[in-house]
């Protein structure tokens, strides 16, 4: 049995499927894909994933893409040390929260990430080179996001994204008043999902929102997450991000 995991820095999508691999104690080959060099759009990588997106799981030559799909695949193939409830009701609750994170959290956090971080990269590239790079991006939506990052997101788009993020953290805060973890009293993929996209860094991303005062249960939950050995190991993974882009402070520095 051979597992290869193609990924970027230990954050967001790449972190979301790396944590389950480690939680389950699965040996895997880590293959770093340098997004800053646009390796995800290089011929060798597009041959693996025609969408030009990380992460990718290669299980004995079978290619699995998209983090929620990868994580469910790991549960099906490697059920030991489960991260999905065994009972149908518990699994349904976990999937509800995963759907919420994928559709209502990730997209809006991503807008701020592209605005504050990717825009710096996009604007640093000469116009001719930028146009050449855009031609190598397989997905139209990704090309659109790169162009938006270069030209800048509108204040209305950013305000709407912030509003949706506030709704999400408030929703999780209310849930944590009822259960120990997001999908119930078990630690599940739903916790990993929200942590990877938002929970691990929402305070640093939006210091002006005073999340610590607004959502104390969320902060306690985040500390439980960060203290998990598998999470700590995943976060210690390779990070080639330029130092000036690593810290979310409400400003791009």
Which residues does each predicted region cover?
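Residue-level signal for nonpolar/aromatic packing positions in well-ordered secondary structure
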Residues: 57, 94, 172, 191, ...
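The C-terminal cap of the DNA-recognition helix in HTH/winged-HTH DNA-binding domains
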Residues: 79, 177-178, 227
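GST-like domain detector, emphasizing the conserved glutathione-binding G-site
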Residues: 1-138, 249-252
């Amino acid at each position: 049995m051979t597992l290869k995991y193609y990924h970027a820095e230990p954050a967001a999508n790449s972190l979301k499927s790396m944590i389950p691999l480690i939680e389950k104690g699965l040996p895997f080959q880590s293959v770093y894909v340098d997004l800053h060099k646009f390796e995800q759009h290089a011929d060798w990588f597009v041959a693996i994933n025609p969408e030009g997106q990380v992460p990718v799981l290669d299980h004995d030559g079978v290619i699995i893409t998209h983090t929620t799909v990868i994580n469910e695949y790991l549960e099906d193939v490697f059920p030991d040390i489960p991260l999905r409830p065994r009972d149908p009701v518990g699994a349904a609750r976990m999937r509800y929260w995963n759907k919420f994170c994928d559709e209502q959290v990730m997209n809006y956090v991503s807008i701020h990430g592209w605005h504050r971080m990717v825009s710096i990269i996009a604007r640093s590239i000469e116009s001719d080179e930028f146009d050449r790079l855009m031609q190598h991006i397989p997905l139209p939506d990704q090309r659109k996001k790169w162009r938006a990052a270069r030209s800048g997101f509108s204040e209305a788009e950013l305000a709407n994204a912030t509003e949706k993020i506030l709704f999400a953290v408030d929703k999780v805060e209310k849930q944590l008043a009822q259960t120990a973890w997001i999908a119930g009293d078990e630690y599940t993929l739903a916790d990993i999902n929200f942590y990877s996209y938002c929970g691990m860094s929402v305070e640093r991303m939006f210091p002006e929102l005073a999340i610590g005062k607004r959502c104390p249960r969320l902060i306690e939950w985040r500390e439980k997450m960060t203290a998990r050995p598998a999470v700590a190991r995943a976060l210690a993974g390779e990070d080639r991000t330029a130092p000036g882009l690593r810290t979310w402070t409400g400003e791009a520095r």
